[in-house]
Amino acid sequence: MAIKVEVFSTNSCPHCPAAIDAAQKAKDKLGDAIDVEILKIDESKDNYQRAIDYQIMAVPTIVIDGDVVFVGAPTDFELIEKLESML
C-alpha cells in the first residue's frame, strides 16, 4: 500500500512552492510507493476542513499517513529520506 503524502498550502504562501516541489521530486524518485496530494486550503472548504481536522496552524505542512511530519518546507533530501525510512 502506498504511503499517503498530503501537502497543505495556500496560494499566497511564499514557502509552499518549495514544499510542493519537494513532494513532486519525492514522487518522481519513489514512484508508486507514495501517493501525493496537494491541498490548497484557500481553494476548497473540504481542504480547509481537513487542515482543521489535522490541527494545522501554518502552511506549508506535510502530513504523511495521517501524521503531521513537517511544518515548513523540507528539503527534497529530508522528505525523501523520511519517506524511504517508512518503506
Sequence positions of predicted segments:
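Structural micro-motif
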Residues: 52-63
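Short alpha-helical
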Residues: 14-15, 45-46, 78
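Non-catalytic, surface beta->alpha helical segment in thiol-disulfide oxidoreductase systems
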Residues: 64-87
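Thiol-based oxidoreductase modules, predominantly thioredoxin-like and allied folds used
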Residues: 32-46
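Hydrophobic residues in alpha-helical membrane-spanning segments
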Residues: 15-18, 61, 75
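Structured beta->alpha junctions
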Residues: 11, 40-43, 68
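Local sequence-structure signature of Cys/Sec-based thiol-disulfide redox active-site neighborhoods
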Residues: 1-29
